[in-house]
Amino acid sequence: MGTVILHSVVSVDGFIADDKGDVGPLHEWYFSGDVPILPGSGSGSGGAEGDEPFDHSGSGGGIRVSRASADYVRSTWDSIGAIVMGRNLFDQVNGWEGKPPAGEHVVVVSHRPKPDGWHPEASYHFVDDVTEAIDTARALAGDGTVAVNAGDVGGQIFAAGLVDEVAMDVVPVVFGSGRRYFGGVDGQHLLEDPHVVIQGERVLHLRFRVRR
């Protein structure tokens, strides 16, 4: 089965959003470069063939990263078979309207079911347990990567020992408070030295294997 990777864009002081859930300048690097990245253009594409991709930029400009980040972002997204997310993020982005940025499948950790009539064609699966979420995502992803969105749910999955790697796109900004990358994790966990270190423009891409 594929690798389970905890991932998010993060401030240098460890926050993925402010107290209200706003990402502020964290995602600016996604939309300020010269190289277009089409969500769902890899080995697993969200939505049916011929569908218009969901506009993750929110402005119609699409995702455009620097050349330094482009190869890393493409290879990362191309490897993803399934995404695991919490209900808060699902509600915030309305599940990307059934068209995730990468992979073909999404598992949502929630005590509430999928909304009635919501994009019945989309491969979105609602479960109420983090272990079940990873088991479901791995089965759906096959040999592909399982990408877990960081935050409260991601922190629970990490604390349960279900994460193989930690991936951070570190942006040079200090939030001071907000929603933490690792959620409520309060114990010590050792990681290996980073095996990926890529300096982009206004972002540093890092990946660490979890020490077992």
Which residues are covered by each model-predicted region?
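Portal/gating segments that form or line small-molecule/metal binding sites
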Residues: 1-160, 172-212
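Short acidic amphipathic segments
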Residues: 162-164
